[in-house]
Amino acid sequence: MSSDPNFSLTSFLECLSQIEHEFLRDKVENPPVLVRKLQELQQKTPGHVASLLHDPETIQQIHQTAHRIEVAVKVFIHIDQKFTSGCSEVVHGTSKVMQEVNVGSPAVGCRNLSEDLPAYHMRKHFLLTLDSPYPTQEEKEGLVRLTNESTARVGLSNATRPPLEVHQLTLWFINARRRSGWSHILKKFAREDRSRMKRLVRAKLSSSTQSSPPSPMPEYPSNNLDNILSDNLGRPLTPADKQQFEDDWASMISWIKYGVKEKVGDWVYDLCAASKKTPKPGMPRPVTTVAKRQPARKTKPAAKPNSRTANPRASTTPSIDSTLDSSKLESTPELSMCSTADTSFSTFGSSLSMSHYNPFQDGNDILQSPTVKARGNRKVKALPKRAGKQQPDEVENGKIPFLCLSVAFV
């Protein structure tokens, strides 16, 4: 800027144009120089404004130049703020990614965490957020992605295992809080209050060799562990209470770091995969039920109730012409009335009319039959005392042999 004591609107405009030009060049050494020139211009202008000639055109150019400088300054300030915010987000995102893929050095609390355990990434997140193991939706999706990628990268033998889903991860955290003992500590030593649990966990982590979670809570100052336990219990802390808390804490950390034998393991996936396979022809289908694993107990069949109806008596009268065993014949009330007759004559109903048949025309042949001689000393069973009435349709249909009727009435 000119040091001429004669101050004018033209010199003022030239000074502003020079500042604008140097500001837009954006050199590292320019900001201090520009600030100094603006300060000098601010000091000279108020004393010469009243004596300046009124030149509307020059004044308009001065306003336009000042407006351009103001707009450029606001843009540069906005760019600088965005750049600073972007750098912070990049640094935070890079640190988060490095922690997820375990590129950087692991935290002190995760050094003993076995990578061979199932749900390694979920256990690690549980340990890092021990004060509040309730992952957000974004964190759940990230853990699901990491778990599925690590499973595919390791190349487990169980290739048919379905990928992990968000709702399964949510159930895992619910079970982990319960099975590890975190919920028990929350209920017994924090009055089921999450804010008290956060203070308790942070106090415990700060008093031990384990690292505290990466996001400290400034609204809760670091207090003594014994004081927090006493406040949560609502009474003076006893050595038994302190020992019980230490035991529960050690059990919880042990479950998270080292794990326990899972109740449901890989055999569930194997069983589901085997049930979907098509069995080969001729091979039995395996059924994994309790009845198949253990031999079935043989039970005695229930005895049939004794019927009070009389069993039909079999006639022991031998057949004259038939060679069948008479023990296989069953008796009927009609046959019992004429048990001394030969029942084989009933077979003549289809080929010979019974009305023209005389059973005694060959009497000598019958007496000479070897069957009659062999059974001459047989005993005839007693007839039933009361015989049922004979229905007329039975006689018409030929159910009662004609020979029996002839013997009965002769």
From Swiss-Prot:
GO terms for biological process?
Answer: regulation of DNA-templated transcription
Which residue ranges carry the DNA-binding annotation?
107-184
Q: Which GO terms describe its molecular function?
A: DNA binding
Is the keyword ATP-binding in the record?
A: no
- Origin superkingdom: Eukaryota
Record carries keyword DNA-binding: yes
Instruction: Please give the name of this protein.
Output: Mating-type locus allele B7 protein
